[in-house]
Curated annotation (Swiss-Prot):
Native species: Felis catus
Keyword Phosphoprotein included in the entry's annotation: yes
Subcellular location: Cytoplasm
Protein keywords: Cytoplasm, Phosphoprotein
Tissues in which the UniProt entry reports expression: Highly expressed in the kidney (at protein level).
Modified-residue entries (Phosphoserine), positions: 73, 87, 97, 113, 119
Location, primary (coarse class): cytoplasm
Record keyword Phosphoprotein present: yes
Modified residues (Phosphothreonine): 56
Name listed for the protein in its UniProt record: Uncharacterized protein C11orf96 homolog
Length: 123
């Protein structure tokens, strides 16, 4: 009996060209996917130059003004202004009440800390 190489005893193929019998069944169990002959759609197409994608039409200042002036009635403008002022007032009140709550909380904490220090000194 010929001496086997250490790698062959463990079932490891020592030569890249030799195929061990137990590896043949793996090829049947897990076949390699067949590659398509064509390239996929995304890679086969020629791309447009990106520079043209970012170009825009020139716009004059007069055109912008016309767009802003169209369709805005004075009544809608007044409603928007009133709504904006109302939301500002609501925001002001909420921040004011929050600051009052903070002041009350900090004064309450200060009072409690002073009370506890007084009781400690009384002992």
């Amino acid at each position: 009996m010929a001496a086997a190489k250490p790698g062959e005893l463990m079932g490891i193929c020592s030569s890249y060209q030799a195929v061990m019998p137990h590896f043949v069944c793996l090829a049947d169990e897990f076949p390699q996917p067949v590659r398509p002959a064509k390239l996929s759609k995304g890679k086969g197409r020629l791309r447009r130059p990106r520079q043209s994608r970012f170009k825009t039409q020139p716009v004059t200042f007069d055109e912008i003004q016309e767009v802003e002036e169209e369709g805005v009635s004075p009544m809608e403008e007044e409603k928007a202004k009133k709504s904006f002022l109302q939301s500002l007032e609501c925001l002001r009140r909420s921040t004011q009440s929050l600051s009052l709550q903070r002041e009350q909380l900090s004064s309450c904490k200060l009072r409690n800390s002073l009370d506890s220090s007084d009781s400690d000194s009384a002992l």
